[in-house]
Amino acid sequence: MRILKRFDKWMAMVAIVCVAMLTGCGKSANEGESTQGEPKADEAVATETTEAQPESESADEDVAVDEGLGAITGNWKSTLITVSPKGNKANIEDFAQAFCSKYDSYEPNKKMLKYLANPKAFDKEKEVYGVISDVSNGYISSCLWTEIDRFTKMCYWNRKNGHQLVGVFMINGSENEEAENAFLFYDFDPNTNTMTPDMDVCKVVEKVALDKDFADYALELPQKGKDIEVKLYSDNGEDGYDITEKLLKWNGDSFTLVAE
């Protein structure tokens, strides 16, 4: 774009000189532009096309990285998600399809959508992502196959009132920055096929996971069983962390912290 700006200034100077010369010769400025302006305009368009396109693609990639989980957590509390079950009853893949489609700027969600579109064609080696879909146990995950933690994990529980509680846990790891993590919970109403943020369950989990006495946390959503394992990390003053584990037991509607 710097080349285009210098080129525009040069064109402006040339235009001024041409106007002065053509005025003296009795020609209009429009006549002068018809012979010189058109080829130069083509050149300018060509330059802008070849240079601006890569910059645009790079900018898009930077935005996706910079947003991280903020693009999801920034407005999820007020966002309802519509689910389109493929069968008579919604399953974990239906929940994942709906959630990841709503928040498809996050890379693990993109990969999960790609897998769900055609599981047999999904190449985990090429994609550098692995997707586990365990429909019978109501669990699905999309994880980056590197030392960096970057994933989306989901599962659901059947509630006493006939609804489902859908849980989501995400970590967005980075080589250069501290990892982001977030958990979300939704109440799914099968009568309306709508996922509504469940802030009551979130508050229960927050009391344990966001304990200020610890530096960080991670949730282990159950692939088998019904309880959530919470890992709390504290800096041990050396080159690592001490881990404290707590258990949130499913009670049919929400979770109860198991006394130590």
Annotate each predicted stretch with a short phrase:
Residues 143-145, 171-179, 236-239:
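Short consensus segments that form the blades of beta-propeller domains
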Residues 33-157:
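Terminal domain-start segments
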